[in-house]
Curated annotation (Swiss-Prot):
Major enzyme class: ligase
Reactions the enzyme catalyzes: (6S)-5,6,7,8-tetrahydrofolate + formate + ATP = (6R)-10-formyltetrahydrofolate + ADP + phosphate
GO molecular function: ATP binding; formate-tetrahydrofolate ligase activity
UniProt family annotation: Belongs to the formate--tetrahydrofolate ligase family.
Pathways involved: One-carbon metabolism; tetrahydrofolate interconversion
Sequence positions that bind ATP: 65-72
EC numbers, comma separated: 6.3.4.3
This protein's UniProt keywords: ATP-binding, Ligase, Nucleotide-binding, One-carbon metabolism
GO annotation terms (biological process): tetrahydrofolate interconversion
Listed name of the protein: Formate--tetrahydrofolate ligase
Amino acid sequence: MLSDIDICRTTPLKPIEQIAAKAGLLADEFETHGLYKAKVSARCVKRLAEQQDGKLVLVTAITPTPLGEGKTVTTIGLAQGLQSLNQSVMACIRQPSMGPVFGVKGGAAGGGYSQVAPMDELNLHLTGDIHAVTAAHNLAAAAIDARIYHEQRAGYQAFEARTGLPALRIDPDRVVWKRVMDHNDRALRKVRVGLNDEGKTINGFEREEGFDISAASELMAILALSKNLQDMRERIGKVVLAYNLDGEPVSAEQLQVAGAMTVTLKEAIKPTLMQTLEGVPTLIHAGPFANIAHGNSSIIADEIALKLSSYVVTEAGFGSDMGLEKACNIKSSTSHKAPDCVVIVATLRGLKANSGLYDLKPGMPLPDALFQPDRAALESGFSNLKWHIDNAQKYGLPAVVAINQFPQDSAEELGQLKLWIQQLPLNVRVAISEGFAKGGKGMEAVAREVIEACDAPANFRPLYRAEQTLEEKIITVCTKGYGCGEVQFSDTAKQQLALYQTLGFGELAVCMAKTPLSISSDSSLKGAPSGFTIMVREVRLCAGAGFVYALTGNVMTMPGLPDIPAFMALDIDENGDIVGLS
């Protein structure tokens, strides 16, 4: 079988104008960026305001191996499968960060015959939205240090007299807005800025600083959760950048940088239209990670697609304990649109990995033994799939299991897994997923199950209520959402939660930052653990995005590169074609 990039390169694509017309967009509702990309205006939502929304299908997964279990392949393949059954369909996915592209996982365009194309354009820069997020974020960071410098170098009164602006009196030790970049770089997690020659202050005042990856920026979450440009502007104004010497929050609005930040994101608020290898219109928008952010593509993209098509297939990052939980408790509470159906991607290798019999490490190849028949390991890891099915139903959502087939998989084990699922005392559908090898035709069985599931009654219910305290919400997600026995809070986390409640942020949602490699916060606990303890070490405020996020375990908001990064395989030939991208 050809490599992903060779399949993509040898598949004829349609001009993006044809894809836009197929989706139902008018000529003034999109702007082309080259031959195969276009920015889409939300004007079409107003035009189609009376149009009934389509069905929203959310693709999630079991607890994955470090290389993932094929959610994007399933998302794109399912959209193609629905099209193959003559359904009107669009897909919505996140924009890939270049951190994973050059780091461990590689690209995020899908794979095989279920890809978004051109995959190299998708994985590398696209239309520049992540760079715009990075620029807007770092503009605020520069504004903070500039304000500290100008206020302190001659004193607050002199600053006010000189500028006519109120002195914000920012506490340099309580700046909470780190800088960001779209690469994995562990050396930047903790740095010092404002270094000067002795006796000088020309470079600003020295303080401790750090970098996050751009996907973890609050602006990325705001981009994904905003309903329109004005909503984004208001949210950016609410972002808390620092605290002053009296312990009061200093916002982007107070720093008078919110308008310029929004201007920087003016084009980024428009989703990018591309196509799958079989011509399904696909919107790519926003790229928050699911382990350190809320892990779902944008509300705006969903809204556009739901007005234009009968089915919209989107995905949520990592397993259902991560992206699905956040889709239900953060995204849906903002958009007021819950999924009509959940598709849970399962693989033989992923379930065997959840047996706990294999030592898997991020950045290292999966052991060959994972692809060998092993009924005992499969049966042991099956508890993980049962947990994720039950988790989807916890939110009142109909579920379909898509068993993502790999070429090495045993037909006997695939049949056995399907039988076990059918024998569960749960209302769940199941089909074998062959989107990687066969494209849409290989996904028709899953598509039929999804159509039936979308017609079944749903009784959506989030885990917690807005009026609960932040601590209660965190405990609810950990106990009801993960099955943990006890939640502990560090002294730092307790102080932060008390501060946020006092400042009036108690009604915000909570976003858990934890390992994706276990339902718990300990990546070594496989299968379906219960009764474990979760330690919340820190809670950060994202007032503009509308949530606080609680850091657990050893989750880092700036990833590092592995021993053998994916960038080592990348190059370019004499024709300008990229090689080694997957």
